C-alpha cells in the first residue's frame, strides 16, 4: 500500500509519541496496541481459562477485563504461554489492521501504522515503508523501569524478547532518533513526516 508507513522500535522508544505528533499534524493512524487491548478485553473470559494454569494470580479485573500487567508477567517468563498468546491474538490483530489499512489507503494520503513487533511478526513486510525510532538500549531500559515500574532484570527480559534495535535500523526506510529532549524528538518527527508527505503527493 503506497500510503502506508509503519512505525516500529524497541520498547519505550517513543512510538506512541510519534503517532500523537503525526495526528496533531492532521495524519491518521492505526495502533496495533490499541487493537490488541480491545481483542484481549473482548476475549477476556476465554483467555482467563487458557492462562489461569500459568499463574496463581487472578487474571480478570472486577470489570471482567484482562489484567494486562499479570498477563505480561506470564508471557515474558514462559515461552509456551507466549506462543499460545501469539497464536490466539496475532491473526485477529493482523486481520483488523489490514481492514483499517485498506480503508485509509483509499483516502490517498499518507497514514501511519504503529506496530511494536513489526519485524518480529513478519506479517506486514512489503505492505509499506518502515520508520524505526532509535533509542540506545541503556536509555530504553531506564524508560521501561520508570514507566512500567519494573526491576532492571524484568526490563531487560522485555527488551531481550525483541529483535535488537541495531538490527531493526538496518531494515529501516526512515530513522528517527529519540535520544534527547521532547522538543528535539518532535523536530525530528516533523522533518520525516514532511518528507513523507512531499514524496507521497
From Swiss-Prot:
Sample GO molecular function, one term: ATP binding
Residues that coordinate or bind ATP: 12-17
DPCK domain sequence ranges: 4-201
Signal sequence residues: none
Superkingdom: Bacteria
GO CC field: cytoplasm
Leading EC class: transferase
Coiled coil (UniProt feature): none
Presence of keyword Zinc-finger: no
GO biological process, alphabetically ordered: coenzyme A biosynthetic process
EC number(s) recorded for this UniProt protein: 2.7.1.24
Name of the protein in its database record: Dephospho-CoA kinase
Gene source species: Campylobacter jejuni subsp. jejuni serotype O:2 (strain ATCC 700819 / NCTC 11168)
Amino acid at each position: 500500500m503506497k500510503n502506508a508507513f509503519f512505525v516500529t522500535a524497541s520498547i519505550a522508544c517513543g512510538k506512541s509519541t510519534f503517532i500523537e505528533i503525526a495526528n496533531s499534524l492532521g495524519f491518521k493512524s492505526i495502533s496495533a496496541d490499541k487493537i490488541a487491548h480491545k481483542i484481549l478485553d473482548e476475549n477476556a473470559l476465554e483467555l482467563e481459562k487458557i492462562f489461569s494454569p500459568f499463574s496463581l494470580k487472578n487474571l480478570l479485573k472486577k470489570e471482567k477485563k484482562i489484567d494486562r500487567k499479570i498477563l505480561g508477567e506470564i508471557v515474558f517468563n514462559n515461552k509456551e504461554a507466549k506462543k499460545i498468546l501469539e497464536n490466539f491474538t496475532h491473526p485477529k490483530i493482523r486481520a483488523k489492521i489490514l481492514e483499517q489499512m485498506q480503508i485509509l489507503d483509499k483516502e490517498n494520503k499518507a497514514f501511519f501504522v504503529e506496530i511494536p513487533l513489526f519485524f518480529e511478526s513478519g506479517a506486514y513486510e512489503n505492505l509499506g515503508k518502515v520508520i524505526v525510532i532509535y533509542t540506545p538500549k541503556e536509555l530504553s531500559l531506564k524508560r521501561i523501569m520508570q514507566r512500567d515500574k519494573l526491576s532492571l532484570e524484568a526490563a531487560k527480559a522485555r527488551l531481550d524478547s525483541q529483535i535488537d534495535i541495531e538490527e531493526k535500523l538496518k531494515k529501516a526506510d526512515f530513522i528517527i532518533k529519540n535520544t534527547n529532549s521532547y522538543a528535539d524528538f518532535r523536530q525530528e518527527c516533523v522533518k520525516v513526516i514532511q518528507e513523507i508527505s512531499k514524496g507521497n503527493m
